[in-house]
From Swiss-Prot:
Species classification: Eukaryota, Fungi, Dikarya, Ascomycota, Taphrinomycotina
Entry keywords, A to Z: DNA-directed RNA polymerase, Nucleus, Transcription
GO molecular function, a single term: single-stranded RNA binding
Annotated protein name in UniProt: DNA-directed RNA polymerase II subunit rpb7
Main location per the UniProt record: nucleus
Length: 172
């Protein structure tokens, strides 16, 4: 999986009750809470903020008429963005006749029944429902290796379509 280091910035508004000697610590804590684990459509998933002790916080400015202060906070972050053609390991979350859904960390992936190997058939009578072949079973909780064939990016989420119809892909 390709991870990236990126310099990012965020404007944080601060209520006057937080002004004081611990203001820098509060801004750092707010940055970590607001950014880590989120998804930016432009950059991908923000996994973590690096060097949290050396985050660059500018002097800030008071917003006229409100009393709030705005601070521009610059930080380095580890990002993950899925790419078409990337081979990944996933955990199956839902199985139905149309295909199955799986999670790759925070990323939701759909594998259509047309992108499952032809020897694997959907068995709706099984408990839980699954796709089964000669020696493989795909059911909720199964670990599978997939290849991403397409991604769709929204403002706060990334969704992917994947396949299992290639060599070395399938149930692990």
């Amino acid at each position: 999986m390709p991870f990236f280091l990126k310099e990012l910035s965020l404007t944080i508004s601060l209520h006057p009750s937080y002004f004081g000697p611990r203001m820098q610590d509060y801004l750092k804590a707010k940055l970590l809470a607001d950014v880590e684990g989120t998804c930016s459509g432009q950059y991908g998933y923000i996994i973590c903020v690096l060097d949290s002790n050396t985050i660059d916080i500018d002097k800030g400015r008071v917003v006229p008429g409100q009393g709030f202060a705005e601070f521009e906070v610059k930080y380095r972050a580890v990002l993950w963005r899925p790419f078409r053609g990337e081979v990944v390991d996933a955990i199956v979350t839902t199985v139905n006749k149309m295909g199955f859904f799986a999670n790759i960390g925070p990323l939701n992936v759909f594998v259509s029944s047309h992108l499952v190997p032809p020897d694997m058939k959907f068995d709706p009578t099984a408990n839980p429902p699954n796709y089964s072949g000669e020696d493989q079973v795909i059911e909720k909780g199964s670990n599978v290796r997939l290849k991403i064939v397409g991604t769709r990016t929204d403002a706060t989420e990334i969704f992917a379509i994947a396949t299992m119809k290639e060599d070395y892909l399938g149930v692990l």
